[in-house]
């Protein structure tokens, strides 16, 4: 009996010796010193890289941002409620990256590119770094193709080109998101992939935008990246970079893409919150010193690629909110200096019923007419000048009692041109319809109408052209020029 036990024991020992694995696992580990407000301070992690992902014992992931001599400051990508003092932390050796694929089109995802629309997982075999480097000088070419927004005021006077960065700036409730969403709706049949990034917004506002896209068939070519107001600051900070990585995937596949950041003021506030909690020194308006770099490295990723790289493009339309129209605040001035122009939306114009409430005098596109088709250049040349003269005359006319006939005519023309620029939300116009509208206004065909009749007349004119003069649209679409034949067809219709 004793022998049997000894045999059993020796066989167990032999078995254990055979199964013994002498591989040594080396891990970069640390322990939590302190946690709260979405920030954890970690002792250890001596070889961690800046921006490296770290994993806590409960599965929460964070990013190492502050590398101190005695501890590491980590921002959490979750609520971190299960993390306690003394919990273990492991460095993953990875920088934040997301899966990318064509299957993302039509989906709503969060800042980690995980679906949040309840339509199941998204299949992807490729990965992109969230913080990818921007294309270099040799990889780019100058912007020369238009990105049509469908808004007359923008396409005629503040044209946006494919690969440009055009800031949309204005107070809250002035129609900034409406301009951006109309631009996405207008890309239907234009072969442009759109990414809409919602940062720190109400969930109801994001749902409304997604519903609009679904009703109008725009989700087929759109990806929505959403981190709402109740999301951790880390995810609100990351969301724009995730959107840019998804758009870049299509740009490097020789496609045209456009991205809306709605809005970067909220991203800057989330970054300020993280920086102050990490005890980084505050600067102007309590923002950290590198808040300019926060936005410049994001917006520099917009580009028109060279012919060697396939001529894809990424057009960025960042939105920034101002307080009481103050464009000289810190974040607005930063964004204006980084971008290639701005569309300024005015609360006064919005309240006066001029919508979209674009202040043409303060708005500018630094790409200019290079991003317009020849037909638009030809008819829109006079429009900006006439509107500028009208604005000056209107201010002067408030003090003058008797005006000569020429001045009265100019004021009447200006009022009708201003009426011509008004558009309903979610009703973008095709470029040929815009050209017909502008030509009608600048050549005096609206002068005999009452101001209240102008919009109705223009709607009927556009319908008549589509129904009875389809050649007009065909000429402009195929040649891109306002030929004598097109002019004759339009004048017949008028």
Swiss-Prot record:
One annotated Gene Ontology cellular component of this protein: chloroplast thylakoid membrane
Q: How does it sit in the membrane?
A: Peripheral membrane protein
Predominantly, its location class is plastid
Record-listed E.C. numbers? 7.1.2.2
Q: Where is this site: Required for activity?
A: 363
One example of the protein's molecular function in GO is:
proton-transporting ATP synthase activity, rotational mechanism
Q: Which UniProt keywords apply?
A: ATP synthesis, ATP-binding, CF(1), Chloroplast, Hydrogen ion transport, Ion transport, Membrane, Nucleotide-binding, Plastid, Thylakoid, Translocase, Transport
**CDD domains of this UniProt entry?**
ATP-synt_F1_alpha_C, ATP-synt_F1_alpha_N, F1-ATPase_alpha_CD
The record lists ATP as bound by 170-177
Q: What class of enzyme is it?
A: translocase
Write out the catalysed reaction.
Answer: ATP + H2O + 4 H(+)(in) = ADP + phosphate + 5 H(+)(out)
Q: Which domain of life is it from?
A: Eukaryota
The subcellular location is: Plastid, Chloroplast thylakoid membrane
Q: Which family does it belong to?
A: Belongs to the ATPase alpha/beta chains family.
Query: Subunit notes for this chain?
Result: F-type ATPases have 2 components, CF(1) - the catalytic core - and CF(0) - the membrane proton channel. CF(1) has five subunits: alpha(3), beta(3), gamma(1), delta(1), epsilon(1). CF(0) has four main subunits: a, b, b' and c.
Q: Which protein is depicted?
A: ATP synthase subunit alpha, chloroplastic
């Amino acid at each position: 009996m004793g022998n049997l036990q000894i045999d059993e024991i020796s066989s167990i020992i032999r078995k254990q010796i055979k199964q013994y694995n002498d591989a040594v696992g080396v891990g970069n580990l640390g322990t939590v010193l302190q946690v709260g407000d979405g920030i954890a301070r970690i002792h250890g992690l001596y070889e961690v890289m800046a921006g490296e992902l770290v994993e806590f014992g409960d599965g929460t992931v964070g990013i190492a941002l502050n590398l101190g001599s005695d501890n590491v400051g980590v921002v959490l990508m979750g609520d971190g409620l299960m993390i306690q003092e003394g919990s273990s932390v492991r460095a993953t050796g990875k920088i934040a990256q997301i899966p990318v694929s064509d299957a993302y089109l039509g989906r709503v995802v969060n800042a980690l590119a995980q679906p949040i629309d309840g339509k199941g997982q998204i299949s992807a075999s490729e990965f992109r770094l969230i913080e990818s480097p921007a294309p270099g000088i040799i990889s780019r070419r100058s912007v020369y193709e238009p990105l049509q927004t469908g808004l007359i005021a923008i396409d005629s006077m503040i044209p946006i080109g494919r690969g440009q960065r055009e800031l949309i700036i204005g107070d809250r409730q002035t129609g900034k998101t409406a301009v951006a969403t109309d631009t996405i709706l207008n890309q239907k049949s234009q072969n442009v992939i759109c990414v809409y990034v919602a940062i720190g917004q109400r969930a109801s506002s994001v749902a409304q935008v997604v519903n609009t896209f679904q009703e109008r068939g725009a989700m087929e070519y759109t990806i929505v990246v959403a981190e709402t107001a109740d999301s951790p600051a880390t995810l609100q900070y990351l969301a724009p970079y995730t959107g840019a990585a998804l758009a870049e995937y299509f740009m490097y596949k020789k496609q045209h893409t456009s991205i809306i950041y709605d809005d970067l003021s909220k991203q800057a506030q989330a970054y300020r919150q993280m920086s102050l909690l990490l005890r980084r020194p505050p600067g102007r308006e309590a923002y950290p010193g590198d808040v300019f770099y926060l936005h410049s490295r994001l917006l520099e990723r917009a580009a028109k690629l060279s012919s060697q790289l396939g001529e894809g493009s990424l057009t960025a339309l960042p939105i920034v909110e101002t307080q009481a129209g103050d464009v000289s605040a810190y974040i607005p001035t930063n964004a204006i200096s980084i971008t290639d122009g701005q569309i300024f939306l005015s609360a006064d114009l919005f309240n006066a019923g001029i919508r979209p409430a674009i202040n043409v005098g303060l708005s500018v596109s630094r790409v200019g007419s290079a991003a317009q088709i020849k037909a638009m250049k030809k008819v829109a040349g006079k429009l900006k000048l006439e509107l500028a003269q009208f604005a000056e005359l209107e201010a002067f006319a408030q003090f003058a009692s008797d005006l000569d006939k020429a001045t009265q005519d100019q004021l009447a023309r200006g009022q009708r041109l201003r009426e011509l620029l008004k558009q309903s939300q979610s009703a973008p116009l095709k470029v040929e319809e815009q050209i017909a509208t502008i030509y009608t206004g600048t050549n005096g065909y609206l002068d005999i109408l009452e101001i209240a009749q102008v919009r109705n007349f223009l709607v009927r004119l556009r319908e008549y052209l589509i129904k009875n003069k389809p050649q007009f649209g065909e000429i402009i679409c195929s040649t891109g020029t306002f030929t004598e034949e097109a002019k004759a067809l339009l004048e017949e219709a008028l």
